[in-house]
Amino acid sequence: MIRNVKKQRPVNLDLQTIRFPITAIASILHRVSGVITFIAVGILLWLLGTSLSSPEGFQQAADIMDGFIVKFIMWGILTALAYHVIVGIRHMLMDFGYLEETFEAGQRSAKISFVITVVLSLLAGVLVW
């Protein structure tokens, strides 16, 4: 016979006291960077279409890219893309069995992914500016 036992567990509703492990943060940021990259594709395709439409369109696209805010947004897009690719490779390596699926290995690979992303982000900053 199955009993329907309701356990009285404490409920913590204060979100500021919840600490996610680094693996959860890496996974959440991977999803966020995927959404950013998806939205950025439309913007970048519009910019490409404008630049290829005519010599005036190319000049218009070049003028758009000269602004600091646009360069900052482009740097953010490149950083999101780099993060998404690096963590995507990490997930694939784990799925194919090349990385251990232990919590410690997950933490270590997430930290390595963050470091690689910071390096690529700095390179993207040099490229954009």
Swiss-Prot record:
Location(s), subcellular: Cell inner membrane
CDD domains: SQR_TypeC_SdhC
Keywords: Cell inner membrane, Cell membrane, Electron transport, Heme, Iron, Membrane, Metal-binding, Transmembrane, Transmembrane helix, Transport, Tricarboxylic acid cycle
GO molecular function: electron transfer activity; metal ion binding
Residues given in the record as heme binding sites: H84
Segments on the Cytoplasmic side according to the record's topology features: 1-26, 90-108
Keyword flag Metal-binding: yes
GO terms of biological process kind: tricarboxylic acid cycle
SUPFAM superfamilies (UniProt xref): Fumarate reductase respiratory complex transmembrane subunits
Electron transport recorded as keyword: yes
Pathway(s) of this molecule: Carbohydrate metabolism; tricarboxylic acid cycle
Membrane side Periplasmic: residue ranges: 53-68
GO cellular component: plasma membrane
Highest taxon listed in the record's lineage: Bacteria
Pfam families reported in the protein's UniProt record: Sdh_cyt (PF01127)
Transmembrane intervals: 27-52, 69-89, 109-129
Cofactor(s) needed for function: heme
Family annotation (Gene3D superfamilies): Fumarate reductase/succinate dehydrogenase, transmembrane subunit
Cofactor note: The heme is bound between the two transmembrane subunits.
Membrane topology: Multi-pass membrane protein
Described purpose of this protein according to its UniProt entry: Membrane-anchoring subunit of succinate dehydrogenase (SDH).
Family the UniProt entry places it in: Belongs to the cytochrome b560 family.
Record-given protein name: Succinate dehydrogenase cytochrome b556 subunit
Organism field: Salmonella typhimurium (strain LT2 / SGSC1412 / ATCC 700720)
